[in-house]
Structure formats: structure tokens, C-alpha cells
Amino acid sequence: MNTSLFNALGYFLEVMRPFVVDVLKKNFPGEPWEGVLYAKLSYDKQRMWNISADNLATSGGDTKNLIDFGNLVSFAISFKDQVIQEVGGKQEANRFISYLQELQAARNKCQHYQELSSTEVEMAFGSMKMIAIMLELEDLKNEIERIQREENAP
């Protein structure tokens, strides 16, 4: 398992969760963001959401933690018009979705202890940095680069 990539993906997700919440709150004022996102999830993702929500309610955790990589992809596809506003155009939104799909695949491999090729690792780091650039999140880009440098340090 690539520990640096796993750490970078975790950090990336922590930054993206508030982004999703902010976009939903901005575009659907007066509606709970959880309900807006939940309504767009597939049946299977809704089932997983419910299980996670029950566990979260027991532990008193933050509902933002219900957002995972699978939900990021669903969010970007289901709320593409809103994503277009955030990233500046339809082509950029399509790239944003592709980057998230790439990251979801890398995250799944990391989570299931499957080996990633050096190319897959580079693509995952690149996808995180490209999303950070698209969203003008300089701190995210810098942190991903720092984690990546640690990976390549002797």
C-alpha cells in the first residue's frame, strides 16, 4: 500500500467535504444539505449512507463525514450545473468529474490493499492537485505536493 497516497487522499477528502456542503447550502438555501445530497444518491449509496449515519449518530460525529469518495463522484455528476459554476465551465466540470473518478479508483485500491502502479500513484496525486487548482485551493495543492515529496524522499 502506498502510505503517502493514502494520507493524501484522506487529507483531500477532509478538504472536499466542506466544499460539497458549501455548494449545496449556497444553491439550496433553507434545505438541509444532507437531504439534498441524499436524494441524488443511488439506492445502494443511500443504504450505505443510512448505516453510516446510524453509526455517526451513536458516536456523535459530524454529518460531513458521511461524504466519501463515492459520494463526491455522485455529487459532481448529480450537481453538475452547480459544479460548472464553481469551476468555470462545462469542460472544466467534466474534467473535475474525471479527476474524482480517478481518485475514487485509487482510493478503492488503497483501501483494499491492492498494489498501485507508479503511474496510477502519479495520476492520483496529479488529479488532487488539478482539482485544487480548479477550485483555487492553494493550501490543498501545497499540502498534496508536500505529501508527495515525502513519498519521493530518500
Regions found by a protein language model. Name each.
Residues 1-154:
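Amphipathic alpha-helical interface elements
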